[in-house]
């Protein structure tokens, strides 16, 4: 921990890029150091979906509020974001929200059903549906996110990660209408209406840029883009329908703030993600991180990549696997320990605590 002046080194390696806002001397900047590949102590640890249903404190709130009510209430956004910080002392907070707030702002109707997941009430079925989607000229409908970030600022002693969904993943929900097993509808658009599909992706990307810039202005310290369904794409499809729009978003951010790109399929697409020069690439659990370092050199950080199912294992096995990954990445100044995807809802808090404590017990 140290006095941190919110100094963010450019993703193009321009070390004099400075963002203001002085943070107190108790601020834990370990994640930000790792995102600059300058961390000389133990790796930072945070976990995707760390503020979720596996926490008893979260489930208690869900008994009082719907998921969307919690996403729309700035005080609840702040409260839920802080739950894993208080429970586990992880090295970063990730904003409590959902990747479907942009489709909600686009008025396609979003609801969440228990044991089903997100449902799009008015899915995209034709070109006219795409043409009707508004451009991001007014972000008033997302003001609750900005206010949630502002509620968090005085209460955090770790970096806050803002996020959005990648255009391809968000479009998948908007076209399929819900989580899909085969993605036939979106593949139909790719092959039969590619230009219309590109129009949709561009609109989502423009909304994503405006939304992420709003989060930057509100005070987040880093960003992550989730491309959860990229693993359904062929290599050429990934280049055309995902990577191009991630690059477009990266260029549209108004400040040199660290950006983590995570996609399912990063064991294949990782070098391509690195080619557009984010601060970090998030890896799924199907690759060996050390080998990815051979093809993704400094100054790009690597984040990941424990199997999420590890958290169902006996506690000694969790410690063993965490220590094996820490040993493998020993001395890597740009390594961030995380899962290869989000925490499952029925995982025990004891398992998560064991993972985090194993990292925190490392020297430094």
UniProtKB/Swiss-Prot annotation:
| Listed pathway(s) | Porphyrin-containing compound metabolism; protoporphyrin-IX biosynthesis; coproporphyrinogen-III from 5-aminolevulinate: step 4/4
Instruction: Give the stretches traversing the membrane.
Output: none
Q: Where does substrate bind?
A: 49-53, 98, 173, 228, 341
Q: Which SUPFAM superfamilies match?
A: UROD/MetE-like (SSF51726)
Pinpoint the site Transition state stabilizer: 98
The catalytic activity, as recorded, is: uroporphyrinogen III + 4 H(+) = coproporphyrinogen III + 4 CO2
Q: Which InterPro entries match?
A: UROD/MetE-like_sf, Uroporphyrinogen_deCO2ase_HemE, Uroporphyrinogen_deCOase
Q: Which GO terms describe its cellular component?
A: cytosol
**Entry annotated with the keyword Secreted:** no
Tell me its EC number(s), please: 4.1.1.37
Which Gene Ontology terms cover its molecular function?
A: uroporphyrinogen decarboxylase activity
Classify the main location: cytoplasm
The record's listing under CDD domains reads:
URO-D
Q: Which PROSITE patterns match?
A: UROD_1 (PS00906), UROD_2 (PS00907)
Similarity remark: Belongs to the uroporphyrinogen decarboxylase family.
Q: What this chain does, per the record? A: Catalyzes the decarboxylation of four acetate groups of uroporphyrinogen-III to yield coproporphyrinogen-III.
Q: What is this protein called?
A: Uroporphyrinogen decarboxylase
């Amino acid at each position: 921990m140290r006095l941190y002046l919110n100094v963010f080194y450019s993703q193009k390696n321009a070390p004099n890029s400075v963002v203001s806002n002085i943070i107190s001397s108790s601020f834990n900047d370990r994640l930000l150091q790792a995102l600059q590949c300058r961390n000389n102590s133990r790796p930072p640890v945070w976990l995707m979906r760390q503020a979720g249903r596996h926490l008893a404190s979260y489930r208690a709130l869900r008994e009082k509020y719907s998921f969307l009510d919690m996403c729309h209430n700035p005080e609840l956004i702040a409260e839920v974001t802080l739950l894993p910080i208080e429970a586990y002392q992880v090295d970063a907070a990730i904003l409590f929200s959902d990747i479907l707030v942009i489709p909600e702002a686009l008025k396609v109707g979003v609801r969440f059903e228990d044991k089903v997941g997100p449902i799009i009430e008015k899915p995209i079925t034709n070109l006219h549906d795409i043409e009707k989607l508004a451009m991001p000229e007014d972000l008033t409908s997302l003001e609750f996110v900005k206010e949630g970030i502002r509620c968090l600022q005085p209460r955090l002693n770790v970096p806050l990660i803002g996020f959005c969904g990648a255009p391809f993943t968000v479009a998948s929900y908007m076209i399929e209408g819900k989580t899909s097993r085969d993605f036939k509808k979106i593949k139909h658009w790719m092959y039969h209406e590619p230009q219309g599909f590109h129009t949709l992706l561009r609109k989502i990307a423009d909304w994503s840029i405006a939304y992420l810039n709003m989060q930057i202005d509100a005070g987040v310290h880093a960003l992550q883009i989730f491309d959860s369904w990229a693993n359904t794409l062929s290599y050429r499809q990934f280049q055309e329908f995902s990577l191009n729009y991630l690059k477009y978003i990266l260029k549209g951010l108004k400040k040199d703030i660290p950006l983590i790109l995570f996609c399912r399929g990063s064991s294949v697409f990782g070098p391509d993600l690195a080619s557009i020069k984010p601060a970090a690439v998030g890896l799924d659990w199907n690759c060996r991180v050390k080998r990815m370092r051979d093809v993704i050199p400094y100054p790009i950080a690597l984040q990941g990549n424990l199997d999420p199912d590890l958290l169902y294992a006996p506690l000694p096995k969790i410690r063993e696997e965490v220590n094996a990954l820490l040993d493998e990445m020993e001395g890597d100044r740009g390594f961030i320990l995380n899962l290869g995807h989000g925490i499952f809802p029925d995982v025990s808090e004891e398992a998560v605590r064991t993972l985090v404590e194993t990292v925190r017990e490392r020297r430094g």
